[in-house]
Swiss-Prot record:
It is found in: Cytoplasm; Nucleus. The gene is FLZ7. Its main location: cytoplasm. Induction: Down-regulated by glucose, sucrose and mannose. This is FCS-Like Zinc finger 7.
Length: 126
């Protein structure tokens, strides 16, 4: 007897969709709307309050002059020092450096790997 190949109990099936009957009015064609309306349910003032962030917005406005300030590393490319344009892709490396292109990111990675290799070679052997 092979392990893991024991017979399994039969899976219980749920109600099939073929057993569900839908009444269709023959008077309308597809795409016609009769008296169909959508109702927007308003939960009142307290409804939306549950989903708001508990951030003190007044303090943030004082700190940043009413606008949000991006982190300093998101302003310029970490390799070529060009400005990072809003709405453009940003390429990250080690979580603390942003780059304008894949090429700049790869060059920084190669530079860091070179520094690591030199550190290993220069360390005294025991």
């Amino acid at each position: 007897m092979l392990l893991g190949n024991r017979p399994r109990p039969q899976m219980q099936r749920t109600a099939s969709i073929t057993r569900i009957t839908i009444e269709v009015d023959g008077d309308q064609t597809a795409g016609q709307d009769s008296d169909v309306s959508m109702t927007v349910v308003d939960g009142g003032e307290n409804y939306a309050q549950r989903f708001l962030s508990p951030v003190n917005h007044q303090r943030n406005e004082r700190k940043y002059g009413g606008r949000s300030s991006p982190s300093s590393f998101l302003v310029n490319c970490g390799f070529c020092k060009r400005g990072l344009a809003p709405g453009r892709d940003i390429y990250m490396y080690k979580g603390d450096a942003a780059f304008c292109s894949i090429e700049c990111r790869e060059q920084q990675m190669e530079h860091d790997e070179g520094k690591t290799r030199n550190r290993v070679v220069l360390s005294p052997s025991k």
